[in-house]
C-alpha cells in the first residue's frame, strides 16, 4: 500500500476547547498535515457536507452535540470520511460505541504525540 501525500489528504478537526484545538493543529502541522479546525459541531458538519474530508478528528465531550452524534451525522453527509476520536474521557463503553459506529481510531487526550500521529497516518493510509 502506498501512503498518501499529507498535502493531498483533507483533515478536519473538531474540539470545543480552543487550546486543545490549537495544540492539535500545531502538532499535525509540524509534520506537514494541513487541517481545517472547528469548535462548533454544526459548522464542522456543514463544512464536511460540502468538502467531504478524508479524515475527521472528533472530540467526544462537547456541550452542544457530543462526538458520537457528530460521528453519526458525519456518516450521513460524508460517508467516506474516516473518523479518529480524541477525548478526555477514557470510557470503554464510549470507545466501543465509537468503534462500532466506524471510527478508525480512538485516543485519550494526553496520548503520546508519536502514537497519535501514527494513528492519523494509518487512518489516512487506509483510504488507499
Model-flagged regions — what are they?
Residues 69, 90-105, 111-114:
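Alpha4 helix (beta4-alpha4-beta5 surface) of REC/receiver domains from two-component response regulators
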Residues 37-55:
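Acidic, metal-coordinating helix/loop segments flanking the phosphotransfer/catalytic sites
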Residues 59, 87:
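Active-site residues of response regulator receiver
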Residues 1-12, 18-19, 25, 114-128:
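Non-catalytic signal-transmission and effector/linker regions of two-component phosphorelay proteins
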Residues 46, 68-79:
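Short amphipathic alpha-helix used as the core "switch/output" element in two-component signaling
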Residues 18-36:
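Two-component/phosphorelay signaling modules centered on CheY-like receiver
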Residues 39-40, 66-69:
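Acidic catalytic/metal-coordinating carboxylates
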Residues 21, 63, 91:
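The feature encodes the CheY-like receiver
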Amino acid at each position: 500500500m502506498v501512503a498518501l501525500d499529507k498535502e493531498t489528504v483533507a483533515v478536519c478537526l473538531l474540539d470545543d476547547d480552543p487550546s486543545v484545538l490549537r495544540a492539535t493543529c500545531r502538532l499535525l502541522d509540524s509534520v506537514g498535515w494541513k487541517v481545517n479546525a472547528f469548535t462548533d459541531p454544526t459548522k464542522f458538519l456543514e463544512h464536511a457536507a460540502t468538502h467531504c474530508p478524508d479524515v475527521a478528528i472528533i472530540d467526544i465531550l462537547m456541550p452542544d452535540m457530543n462526538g458520537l452524534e457528530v460521528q453519526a451525522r458525519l456518516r450521513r453527509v460524508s460517508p467516506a470520511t474516516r473518523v479518529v476520536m480524541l477525548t478526555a474521557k477514557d470510557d470503554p463503553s464510549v470507545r466501543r460505541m465509537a468503534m462500532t459506529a466506524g471510527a478508525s481510531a480512538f485516543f485519550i487526550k494526553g496520548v503520546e504525540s508519536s502514537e497519535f500521529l501514527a494513528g492519523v497516518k494509518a487512518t489516512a493510509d487506509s483510504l488507499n
